[in-house]
Amino acid sequence: KNIQTQETNFVPPYESEYFDGPFDETGTYTTDDYFARVAGNDRKVDMAISRIPIPTPEMGQWIVEKIKRYETESTHGEWQSTVTLVADDGLTTLTDDGTEHTQGSEDLAIYSIPDDMQKHKVYLAEYPVENVPNGRRKPAVTAQLLNEVNTNGSVLLSWVGHGSPRVWAHELIFERETTIPQMTNMNKLFFLTAATCDFARFDDGDHQSGAEELVFSKVGGAIGVFAASRPVFSSENKQIAALFYKFLFTRGADGKYLRLGDIMYNVKQERNSLNDEKYFLLGDPTMRLLFPEDIVRIDAINGKPVTDSVPMMPL
């Protein structure tokens, strides 16, 4: 498959044949779904799977510690009911590209995220452009993103827009090398959903993707990532992201939110196109996100049970 690296991959994913054509990047894919189809001849996975592409034993120990800290030492607060939605604009004003990403994020906010969650929106279309020798930049977006992550905190972070293994947007509002070290949210780790191209290209033996480095970060970043390993199409990204959020906020028979692996399993039961197969869960499949679990019920007002009837005086 023309893959050359000095590193050893002990759990290799399924790699498609190299496709030589005008859309060679979108025609190739890597997936773990192939190994999870163990019953029948359909394309549905038969078990819940995820992946943590750990490069060294030391990093493996750190990931275990990071997961433990998330589950036992995270700060309690409003961040647990906060979702930060970041959406791309268009490269130019000549197409509806920017509208597409903003609308995709708005659809998540309106139709897929419950009303009792706080929704903080960082949409590139609303921020000023700075033209520098290297191109268009929007540093105010990066500043606001870091403020949401570090100061306010978010249990979920959503990115909808253009991307690569190391950057988001043509304005580089997120850069793997510089943005991740500034995310110092160790007590308020977010889970990232990235409806973008190959941000989780973990099978490049010579470089770590942004998704991996967010999970590996020792100062904060992410506790897990749902993202694609190859270039993908925005229309299908929107659909699989909406389904992922649907199950994120679904409670099981025990009244608890679903585990990440069960969420991924449910998503892959309903969606298994080539575009969908490129999406991975990087993280612990047995984990539940730290959504607020307490349910408040009013059973009495001023000592009177709410079930009591109250006589109304005639007008």
Task: State where each predicted segment sits.
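Cysteine-dependent hydrolase recognition
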Residues: 1-315
